[in-house]
Amino acid sequence: MSRLAECTISDTVDELVQRAKLAEQAERYDDMAGACKTMAKMRNELNNEEANLLSVAYKNVVGARRSSWRIMSSIAKKQAGTPLAHQHDIYLKKVEEELIQICNDVLALPVLPITEKIGAEAKIFYYKMMGDYYRYSAEVQEGEQNDKSTEAAEEANQKATSLAEAELSVTHPIRLGLALNFSVFYYEIKNMPEKACSLAKAAFDAAITEVDSIKDETYKDSTLIMQLLRDNLTLWNSECETDS
C-alpha cells in the first residue's frame, strides 16, 4: 500500500509550512500531505494558513485515489465474467485500501477530535473536514462499514451546519462549501435527491440575496461555490421534480 512521505519531527513548523508550499507548487501532493501531517502532530491548533494547506494537500491526495477508484470500478464492471475480471478486482481493492487509509489518516489527526478551545470558524472547518472524509470512505465501503461511515459523515455535517448557521454569514465560503458538500452527501451517499436539492437551493437562494455584501477577499471563492451549487441543482433538477 502506498504511504505518504512524512517529515521528521526535528523540522520546525515554519520549515514544514515552507516545504508544504513548495510541494504544492511542484504538484507533489503526497509530499505536501506528509509535511502537513507532521505539522499537525506538532500543533494543538493550526492557524488559517496551516489549516488551508492541510486541506488542499489531502483534498488532492484523496482526489487522485477517488478518481482512480471510479475509473477502475467502471472497468471492473465491464470486465465482469471475463478472464481479466479477477485482476481488475485485485487492483480495485488496492485503490480502495489506499483511499480508506488516507481518510483514516486525516480522521486520526490531532486537530480531530474537535475541542472547545478553538473558535467557531475552526470548529466548522474541522467538522466539515470530518464529514468529507467519512463520506469519501463511505463511497467505497459496503455493509456495516458503509453504514458507520455514512452515519459519522451525517453527524459531522449536521454539527458543522448548526454552527455555521449560527456563526457565519450566508455568503461565507466555508458555509457555502459545507452546504455544497452536504448536499452531495445526500445525493450520492444517502440517495436522497430531494433533500440534496432542498439543501443546495436554500444555500444558494440565501447567498444570492446577499451577493453584493460579499467581502473582496472572499468574493472569488464564494461566487465559485455558488456557481457549483447552481450547477448541481441544474443537474439534479429532473430527479428532484420527479420525487416531489
UniProtKB/Swiss-Prot annotation:
A Pfam family reported for this protein in Swiss-Prot or TrEMBL: 14-3-3
SMART domains linked to this entry: 14_3_3
Source organism superkingdom: Eukaryota
Family: Belongs to the 14-3-3 family.
Name the record gives this protein: 14-3-3 protein homolog 1
Organism field: Echinococcus granulosus
